[in-house]
C-alpha cells in the first residue's frame, strides 16, 4: 500500500459562527486555529457559516414557497391564454 496517498483523517471541531454551536467529528479539513474541547484535548477548529443549529430547514423557520400562487399571479398579470394564437389555420 502506498504511503501519503490519502489525506490525514483526524478529529476536528466545527464551530457555527452565527449560532455559537460547536461539534466534534472526524474530518480531513485543516485549520491553523485550535480549541480546547470539553475532554481537555486540543483540536483544530473550522469555522462554518451555517450548521444544523442555524439552518432554517432544521430550526423549523423554513419558508415554504407557494408555487401555485406564483402561477396564478403570473396568469393574472399576463393573461391565462386570452387572445393567444393557437397555431391552427382556419
Swiss-Prot record:
Which key words are in the record?
A: Ribonucleoprotein, Ribosomal protein
GO CC list: ribonucleoprotein complex; ribosome
- GO BP: any one term: translation
- The question of whether GTP-binding is a record keyword is answered with no
Q: Which InterPro entries match?
A: Ribosomal_bL28/bL31-like_sf, Ribosomal_bL31, Ribosomal_bL31_B, Ribosomal_bL31_sf
The record's GO molecular-function terms, alphabetically, read: structural constituent of ribosome
Name the SUPFAM superfamilies for this protein: L28p-like
Instruction: Say yes or no: keyword Ribosomal protein present.
Output: yes
Family, according to the entry, reads as follows: Belongs to the bacterial ribosomal protein bL31 family. Type B subfamily.
Q: What is this protein called?
A: Large ribosomal subunit protein bL31B-1
Species in which this protein is naturally found: Streptomyces coelicolor (strain ATCC BAA-471 / A3(2) / M145)
Amino acid at each position: 500500500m502506498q504511503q501519503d496517498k490519502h489525506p490525514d483523517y483526524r478529529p476536528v471541531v466545527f464551530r457555527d459562527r452565527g449560532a455559537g454551536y460547536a461539534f466534534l467529528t472526524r474530518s480531513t479539513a485543516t485549520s491553523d486555529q485550535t480549541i480546547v474541547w470539553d475532554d481537555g484535548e486540543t483540536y483544530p477548529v473550522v469555522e462554518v457559516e451555517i450548521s444544523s443549529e442555524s439552518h432554517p430547514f432544521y430550526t423549523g423557520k423554513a419558508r415554504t414557497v407557494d408555487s401555485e400562487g406564483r402561477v396564478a399571479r403570473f396568469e393574472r398579470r399576463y393573461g391565462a391564454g386570452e387572445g393567444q394564437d393557437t397555431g391552427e389555420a382556419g
